[in-house]
């Protein structure tokens, strides 16, 4: 029960740094060697938008990390991890094709990623269409400026579709940003945001001014409010009314009043509907029956005339679109 900590991983090795990443990508557990390598100790505060877990009520790091709390360790071990990104892309293409998917999007494209994708594109190695969405806080504007030729236009199966923002964590990991508290655990705990309202407003306005599509990760309804508020304000301030097809990604705990606002913005609801199958029991425990039974509200969105699509957040779950349809129907 509960999340593992460094005491579990220290049984494997106290000398070799170990990083165990949750399948969602939002949580991690590391051993004592990894904490030491990242220079995380009792004096290290939790960063904005993340958590460094502690043992009991003290300050000793437990090895449990959330969101931005993982960054120091990930950066510290990066040079020790040899990742063949091109090889991963080749393998994933095969998996997507086997599941009947011929167009995919990369929702967190880095400068290194786009260079690899460009090389694969030029070499005829892309067998499916790839739409890249660089993260705005991580050099997204630079990537777009340096690759104008593939912005909105395919070149050898590759194009940049717009920008990506991540506003919160995951509901199953209790880091999604909610307006009402989670059940159990710390009283009044609602998760937390990744960025301030001012930061989000700046990025959203930039995307609108550049007339680029914006995909925004919102698992919690508070994150949804932050996105909707920023987009409504950006439209008002810029007076740009053309349909830029903004997308709310995940929509796990989106409320009906938020769906109504999305209609006015012509916002697309991209729903990770497989949550009801993979983590439905966790959501009921975290949110109770009222909110838990409103996870992934596909029909409520469709009844309002919203454009709805499904995704699997691969590699979080396999890219089986028919399973997503089954989850939505049954």
Regions found by a protein language model. Give the residues of each.
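Distinct, well-ordered alpha-helical segments
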Residues: 115-119, 142-149, 224-238
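His/Asp/Glu-enriched, well-ordered alpha-helical/loop segment
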Residues: 205-215, 222-246, 251, 256-330
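Short helix-capping segments at alpha-helix termini
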Residues: 122-127, 152-153, 234-242
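Catalytic pocket of metal/acid-base enzymes, prominently hydrolases
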Residues: 2-132, 154-208
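Active-site-proximal beta-alpha core segment in soluble small-molecule metabolic enzymes
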Residues: 129-134, 138-143
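Generic beta-strand/beta-sheet core signal
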Residues: 21, 106-107, 131-135, 161-168, ...
């Amino acid at each position: 029960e509960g999340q593992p900590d460094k005491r579990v991983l220290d049984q494997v090795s106290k000398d070799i740094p170990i990083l165990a990443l949750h399948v969602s990508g939002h949580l991690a557990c590391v051993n004592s060697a990894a904490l030491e390598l990242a220079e995380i100790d009792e004096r290290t505060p939790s960063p904005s938008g993340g958590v460094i877990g502690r043992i009991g009520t003290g300050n000793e790091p437990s090895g449990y990390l959330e969101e931005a709390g993982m960054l120091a360790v990930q950066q510290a071990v990066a040079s020790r991890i040899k990742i063949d990104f091109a090889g991963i892309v080749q393998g994933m293409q095969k998996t997507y094709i086997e599941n009947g998917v011929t167009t995919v999007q990369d929702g967190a494209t880095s400068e290194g990623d786009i260079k690899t994708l460009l090389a694969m594109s030029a070499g005829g190695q892309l067998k499916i269409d790839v739409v890249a969405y660089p993260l705005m806080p991580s050099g997204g504007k630079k990537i777009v400026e340096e690759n104008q030729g593939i912005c909105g236009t395919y070149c050898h199966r590759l194009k940049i579709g717009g920008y990506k923002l991540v506003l919160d964590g995951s509901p199953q990991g209790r880091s999604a940003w909610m307006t009402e508290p989670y059940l159990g655990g710390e009283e009044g705990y609602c998760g937390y945001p990744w960025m301030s309202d001012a930061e989000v407003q700046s990025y959203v306005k930039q995307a609108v001014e550049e007339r680029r599509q914006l995909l925004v990760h919102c698992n919690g309804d508070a994150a949804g409010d932050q996105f909707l508020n920023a987009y409504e304000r950006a439209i008002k301030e810029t007076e740009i009314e053309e349909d830029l097809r903004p997308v709310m990604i995940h929509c796990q705990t989106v409320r009906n009043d938020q769906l109504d606002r999305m209609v006015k913005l012509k916002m697309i609801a991209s729903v990770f509907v497989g949550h009801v199958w993979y983590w439905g029991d966790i959501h009921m425990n975290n949110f109770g029956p009222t909110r838990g039974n409103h996870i992934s509200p596909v029909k409520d969105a469709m009844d309002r005339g919203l454009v709805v699509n499904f995704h699997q957040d691969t590699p979080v779950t396999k890219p089986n679109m028919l399973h997503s349809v089954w989850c939505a129907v049954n």
